């Protein structure tokens, strides 16, 4: 059984889901954490992923309520389905599904384990620690993430590094990305716009941070007179509407795009500004100029290769960063090395084999079933 609930999970697990569907009696579950069409269903269609076998409608009015709903609804489903193993990815509320599986002695596997930003104000940091320390088998992307898990006392024999799945995903859908007509549809020219994506609670909810974001977007649109395309997460749009924000004409708010269209925009933008956790990986793999709109991160391996610059919402730092990025060679003309742990071509094969290899191991060693 694989449990998903948000767009990043669906994207990163797309090839793993296909592999598990081919080789196992696979059950796909969507918790409904972010069941907005633009955020979820459009990605199932664009990535050619089948619809989930179960949709749990677990979204609550708060993070705590959502986690509680996920735990209780998944627990009931586990009784019904009786899966041999459970797989989750990342650090979302949907990953709390690992708790009832653990309680029922079902082997649990966690992809993207070991990420740490060392800032407990970040909600995902809390979930990471809970899930990492609950999972039977942790599958980090990098050597650094693996070292964090060992430092926290987790057994090395229950940690298997896989590398990031995103290279395999991007390669599989490359033709679709190349064929995207999104620039023409939006009336954009290559290299003549900025692309922005921001949705994190710490950038949207506090008044001070949100005010800085609004100032940044307006300043960016005035600096070069270029369109600023903002892929607007529902949380961000809700905050904008509630605050009655007025943006400059060049700031264009658009609904979340398909995977193919969004990556086409990233490849062709003058620069991408994002607070997404995936920006470090995508900018390293695809080699486009990128700024991380955060004050902390959980991917030091990306910083070691300078694949992205971390600037927060500081307008001066953003402008300074953009001046540097304009000189960055793009595409195959690299000046920055691709992060080694982001270049794995066969992560879906690894994950399939790890699950099949360790399910019986966990039953025997952890649960003493035989």
Predicted regions, residues:
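Short alpha-helical donor nucleotide-sugar binding micro-motif in glycosyltransferases
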Residues: 74, 78, 264-269
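A nucleotide-sugar donor-handling region in carbohydrate enzymes
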Residues: 33-38, 57, 134-209, 311, ...
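A donor-sugar binding/catalytic signature common to diverse glycosyltransferases
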Residues: 88-89, 95-98, 110-111, 138, ...
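Active-site and donor-binding regions of nucleotide-sugar-utilizing enzymes
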Residues: 1-4, 9-16, 43, 55-153
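C-terminal amphipathic helix plus adjacent low-complexity
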Residues: 327-370
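Donor-nucleotide binding loops and adjacent catalytic segments primarily
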Residues: 33-36, 41-43, 178-268, 369
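Conserved nucleotide-sugar phosphate-binding/catalytic loop shared by glycosyltransferases and other
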Residues: 25-66
């Amino acid at each position: 059984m694989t449990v998903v609930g948000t767009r990043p999970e669906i994207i990163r697990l797309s090839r793993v889901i296909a592999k598990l569907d081919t080789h196992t009696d696979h059950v796909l579950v969507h918790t409904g954490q972010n069941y907005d069409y633009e955020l979820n269903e459009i990605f199932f269609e664009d990535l050619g992923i089948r619809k989930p076998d179960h949709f749990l409608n677990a979204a609550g009015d708060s993070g705590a309520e959502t986690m509680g709903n996920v735990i209780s609804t998944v627990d009931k489903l586990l009784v019904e389905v009786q899966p041999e193993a459970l797989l989750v990815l990342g650090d979302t509320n949907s990953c709390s599904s690992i708790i009832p599986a653990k309680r029922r002695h079902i082997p649990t596997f966690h992809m993207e384990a070991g990420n740490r930003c060392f800032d407990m104000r970040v909600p995902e940091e809390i979930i990471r620690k809970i899930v990492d320390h609950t999972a039977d088998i942790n599958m980090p992307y990098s050597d650094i993430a693996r070292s964090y898990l060992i430092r926290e006392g987790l057994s090395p024999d229950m940690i298997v590094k896989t590398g990031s799945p995103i290279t395999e995903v991007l390669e599989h859908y490359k033709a679709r990305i190349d064929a995207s007509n999104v620039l023409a549809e939006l009336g954009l020219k290559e290299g003549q716009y900025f692309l922005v994506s921001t949705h994190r609670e710490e950038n949207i909810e506090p008044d001070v941070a949100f005010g800085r974001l609004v100032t940044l977007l307006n300043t960016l649109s005035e600096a070069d007179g270029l369109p600023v395309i903002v892929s607007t997460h529902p949380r961000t749009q809700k905050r904008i509407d509630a605050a009655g924000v007025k943006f400059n004409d060049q700031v264009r708010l658009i609904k979340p795009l398909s995977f193919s269209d969004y990556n086409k925009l990233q490849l062709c933008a003058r620069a991408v500004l994002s607070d997404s956790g995936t920006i470090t990986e995508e900018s390293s793999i695809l080699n486009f100029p990128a700024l991380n709109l955060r004050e902390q991160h959980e991917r030091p391996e990306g910083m070691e290769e300078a694949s992205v610059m971390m600037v927060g919402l500081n307008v001066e730092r953003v402008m300074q960063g953009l001046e540097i990025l304009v000189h960055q060679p793009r595409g195959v003309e690299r000046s920055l090395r691709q992060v080694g742990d982001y270049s794995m071509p066969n992560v879906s094969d690894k994950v399939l084999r790890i699950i099949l290899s360790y399910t019986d191991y966990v039953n025997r060693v952890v649960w003493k079933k035989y």
